[in-house]
Amino acid sequence: MHLLPLTVSATAVVSAASSPHAKRAAIDECLKNAKVPVTARNSTEWKTDASPFNDRLPYTPAAIAKPATVEHIQAAVLCAAEVGVKANPKSGGHSYASFGLGGEDGHLVVELDRMYNVTLDPETHIATVQPGARLGHIATVLYEEGKRAFSHGTCPGVGVGGHSLHGGFGFSSHSHGLAVDWITSADVVLANGSLVTASETENPDLFWALRGAGSNFGIVASFRFKTFAAPPNVTSYEINLPWTNSSNVVKGWGALQEWLLNGGMPEEMNMRVLGNAFQTQLQGLYHGNASALKTAIQPLLALLDANLSSVQEHDWMEGFRHYAYSGEIDITDPGYDQSETFYSKSLVTSALPPDVLERVAEYWIETANKVRRSWYIIIDMYGGPNSAVTRVPPGAGSYAFRDPERHLFLYELYDRSFGPYPDDGFAFLDGWVHAFTGGLDSSDWGMYINYADPGLDRAEAQEVYYRQNLDRLRRIKQQLDPTELFYYPQAVEPAEV
């Protein structure tokens, strides 16, 4: 454990009952005295740093620290503790619930996107990654320096911090697992300002907690990831599905889940269903060449009575770019401010029994397809006997969804509005989720915090995000952060003592 080699002090201790204005003044003075760089209020930079990814959920921070060093992070945490404001790390700022801004007004935001260095050890192939690096920058550096990679999502602007600490699924996950599975150690600033290393051998309880619920226990100042050799070829593909009526949805989905459960999807294949009101497709990225893809996918095509509508072979970075939906990949500019207005929900489920599948299909056709906003549903082929995600032992970290049968599909339900989000919009996705969960045992479904749903209350959110791991997480929270310095509305609660 490394204690901060400096002290910080506000002019006066600010009580918990002090006004927001008094706390802002106190945190400003404390950060100034500690020489922590900050974002000036009412500046253009403040507008960017305080902007949410979800425009539906803007919040006003008490202050924004923009550290350039680990010592700055430590000092910022100590200032928050002394003044009595909650602190939240913000890596890329893509939280669907604006948790990087605190999920409410009045928090200290520790804006990490100025700390984005990535280095690769040429002998061990371990990547050292600062917490503000975005996925596109990481992918670019690892490939350019050594043709290496680790498994992560497809959006280049997403920050590594929240993404990897809470899962991190993408088009290499069926082959290589989640981003969280590639973390070998991390340097973490705790609520008392100390800097500790967490790994299998150092602070193992913290390391376990970080790998699935990391934002609750501290601010990661540096990650170390193992990497794999990027394959020389990957192949993107699309298959149009005739899911235009509920019977076709039931038939096609049923065939797909049987194929997945029975080991038909090889490890090299990564796949999702992408559906909206206008079309439904299977999309994916095969880790191999086009010829190998066509051979591997032929049994599924026969089951679905379908054909490949698109096949493109790429090198690794071209494959990443294909599904990035972004012209820019190597993003390091702190001025990056992509945003949308939306509501989103998630699910992780087992295979769907016939009655649930029929209810979900009916909702899709009769309700969802009549909604004329820009909604979509993504159904990721997540589990099954060949999935690297569910091959990880359940106790390896606090990430909860590792059963190859009970955790077969990962869903993102996303409803975007191009104006103010309508008051009746929430019922649309809530109803769709209920169509799934109404017929499933609670052990057969959960939710994924990287698609956070702010409509859940705190107790429900903790339960569906962490399931069997919640009690242990609460005990570790009590040990490391009993006063909940690292708080947001769905944060893990400390265990009662």
UniProtKB/Swiss-Prot annotation:
Linked residues for 6-(S-cysteinyl)-8alpha-(pros-histidyl)-FAD (His-Cys): H94-C155
One GO MF term attached to the UniProt entry: oxidoreductase activity
Superkingdom assignment: Eukaryota
Thermal properties of activity per the entry: Optimum temperature is 30 degrees Celsius. Stable up to 60 degrees Celsius.
Enzyme Commission designation: 1.1.3.-
Keywords, ordered alphabetically: Disulfide bond, FAD, Flavoprotein, Glycoprotein, Nucleotide-binding, Oxidoreductase, Secreted, Signal
Chief localization: secreted
Modified how: The FAD cofactor is bound via a bicovalent 6-S-cysteinyl, 8alpha-N1-histidyl FAD linkage.
Matching PANTHER family: BINDING OXIDOREDUCTASE, PUTATIVE (AFU_ORTHOLOGUE AFUA_1G17690)-RELATED, FAD-BINDING PCMH-TYPE DOMAIN-CONTAINING PROTEIN
Protein's UniProt name: Xylooligosaccharide oxidase
Phylogenetic lineage: Eukaryota, Fungi, Dikarya, Ascomycota, Pezizomycotina
